[in-house]
Each structure stands twice: as C-alpha cells, then as structure tokens.
Curated annotation (Swiss-Prot):
Name assigned to this protein: RHOMBOID-like protein 3
Membrane topology reported for the UniProt record: Multi-pass membrane protein
Cysteines engaged in disulfide bonds, as pairs: none
Reaction catalysis annotation: Cleaves type-1 transmembrane domains using a catalytic dyad composed of serine and histidine that are contributed by different transmembrane domains
EC number: 3.4.21.105
Known role: Probable rhomboid-type serine protease that catalyzes intramembrane proteolysis.
InterPro entries recorded: Peptidase_S54_rhomboid-like, Peptidase_S54_rhomboid_dom, Rhomboid-like_sf
Chief subcellular location: Golgi
Region (Disordered) residue spans: 1-32
Catalytic residues of the enzyme: 201 (nucleophile), 253 (charge relay system)
Length: 346
C-alpha cells in the first residue's frame, strides 16, 4: 500500500502469545515505506547518476524471506493445534494442510502463531537480555507474522531496495539493510518489554533514511534537489506519523531510520563530477579532491555517532536498563492516546 500498506512491524502481546486455552494473539502493525519514494533520490538528478550495477541481493532477500515464512508455517503445523481450534476456530485455507494459517482470531494476518514465531527467533526482551539470546536482534527481521505482513514488506523492499542496489551496489545496500534492522531491534528492545516482535520495518526505514542522507551528502550534484527533498520528507513524516497509532511499534522504525540515515553519509557519498571526468581533462590540470570537505566531515561525524550509539544502546540493553526511565516522553513515539483509543496496554 502506499502509506497504509506500509511495512508491518508486527508486535504480539507477551501475555497473549500462548496457544490453546492460554489466550489469543494481539498484533502490532507498523507501516512499510511508501512506494512513492521507492526509487533513490537520484531519480530527480542527472543522467550521470544512472544505474551501474545489476540488482541481485534484494531479490535474494525477498526469496529468503518467503522461504523463512514457508518454514515458519511448516513448523507451526496449524492442524495439530486441536485445543486452540476448539476455542478460536479452525485453520484458514485448510487445503494447504500443514501450511494452513492459524484461525483469524489468533492471527488476522494469515500466518503462524506467536508461539511459533517466538520459537524461531522473534525479538523478545527477556530472551535477549536474561537468556543472552542476542541473535534475536537479527533473526527477527527475517520472520513475518502473516501473508499480509510479508507481502507489504517485500513489496516495499523491491520498490526501494532494487533501485538503491542498482546505483550503489549490493555491499553497501546490504550493510545498510542489515545494520538498520539490528538498530531498529535494539531501540525497540530498550523501550518495549511486554511484546515479541517480527518484521523488516526497521531495515526498510533504514533504506529510507539512507536515501535522505544520500541526498544531503551529494547535494551539489543534483538537479531538482528541492523536489527530491520535499518528496522524501513527506514520505518519511507520513510513515513515522502512522507509528503513533495503537499497536504500531515506532521504536523499530525510528531506530532503523536513524541507523540508515547515518550509514548513508558513510557509505553513499558520490565523487565530484570533476573527479570522475579527470581522465578527459587536459594534461597538467590540477586534480581535485575526490570528495568535498563537507562530505568528509559528515562521514567522520556519522561514523562517530553510529559507533557511539550502538555501543551505548547495547550496553544499556544487556545491563537490563529500561529506555523509558531515561526518556519520559518517548512512550508517545509508540502511541499517542486520544478520545478514540487508549494506550495503557499497547
């Protein structure tokens, strides 16, 4: 979807994640980035910024996510949950046999139970901190709560990621995607303790953040830069605003976005045009620096902030600190109470 079809960062309440008579699942749905900003900001620039690589990593990410979802459904084995079905209804799409979906009362996104997701590597504070299962910070971004969740995320990944990979190559975009996903998981774990989390929204917001910083650091080589900036800011603000609705985890979005934003300054700076054209210049022409001074400064500042941010956040997380104790207003990033809904148990 555009804004509404955005990335689903699914969060299920810890107290409801059991199966059978232990109660139902409650989903947190977060938005995937809007397909208007799907292409890189270079779309607004000159032809000299055209694609240079063939995209293969992003399609592989899509295949991997689909494969993991199929494995999750196989492990889930909905027809085997007899007690749960007696209380909540029957499996959906029974013709799929073992791969059929949980009853809609359990999971309205057409997917496995939260118990299965937890078993396969969903993000949960107690397991990450108390049981030292830090690998969940990475594995959770490959799991999806259902077909709707998976489809929205993969559609966003294809629209955003392929164009970026064509312009900057698989190494840089792969690093941004994975580190942004981890950054989103870390921030989410710092502020949310009563839910499990799956989904790639942190990684996808990281790609959006890198698009914005790439525009800033390469500002002088773009045409129509104001149009590009306004479009990106509009898309980003709309997506982040949706995150303040109930059952939407905005912390993963913000953490992924900030990580990707800093990585964009580090990995996506482009050489000046005069440097690229140096071979065609007359002999004896003084060589220009490959990058402008402000690009070097942004690179250094972003690298320091990124390393410091990860070190501080990980130390706080594994020491068991609660981010809400250090930021009294940050809970509003997760949900803003109104006359139409409450945020007490969100």
């Amino acid at each position: 979807m555009a804004v509404g079809d955005d990335d689903l960062e699914n969060r299920m309440s810890a107290k409801d994640r059991g199966i059978g008579s232990r109660g139902g699942d409650r989903n947190r749905i977060g938005p995937p980035p809007l397909p208007v900003a799907l292409s890189s900001s270079t779309e607004f620039g000159d032809n000299a910024l055209s694609s240079r690589w063939t995209s293969w990593l992003v399609p592989m990410f899509v295949v991997a996510n689909v494969a993991v979802f199929v494995v999750a459904m196989f492990v889930n084995n909905c027809p085997n949950h007899f007690e749960s079905h007696r209380l909540r209804g029957h499996c959906v799409a029974k013709f799929l046999g073992r791969l059929s979906f949980e009853p809609l009362r359990t999971n309205p996104l057409f997917g496995p139970s939260s118990h299965t997701l937890e078993k396969l590597g969903a993000l949960e504070w107690s397991k990450v901190v108390e049981k030292k299962e830090g690998w969940r910070l990475l594995t959770c971004i490959w799991l999806h709560a259902g077909v709707i969740h998976l489809g929205a995320n993969m559609l966003s990944l294809v629209f955003i990621g392929i164009r970026l990979e064509q312009q900057f190559g698989f190494v840089r975009i792969g690093v941004i995607y994975l580190l942004s996903g981890i950054g989103g998981s870390v921030l989410s774990s710092l502020f949310i303790r009563n839910s499990i989390s799956v989904g790639a929204s942190g990684a996808l917001f990281g790609l959006l953040g890198s698009m914005l910083s790439e525009l800033f650091t390469n500002w002088t080589i773009y045409s129509n830069k104001i149009a590009a900036l306004l479009t990106l800011l509009f898309v980003i603000l709309i997506n982040l605003a949706i995150g303040i609705l109930p059952h939407v985890d905005n912390f993963a979005h913000v953490g992924g976005f900030v990580t990707g934003f800093l990585l964009g300054f580090i990995l996506l700076a482009r050489p000046q045009f005069k440097w690229l054209a140096r071979e065609h210049m007359p002999q004896g022409t003084p060589l220009r620096y490959k990058y402008k001074t402000y690009q070097y400064l942004l690179w250094l500042l972003s690298l320091v902030l990124l390393i410091a941010g990860f070190v501080v956040a990980l130390l706080m997380l594994f020491r068991g600190e609660n981010g809400n104790d250090h930021c009294r207003w940050c809970h509003y990033l997760r949900c803003v109470p109104t006359s139409s809904w409450r945020c007490d148990d969100v």
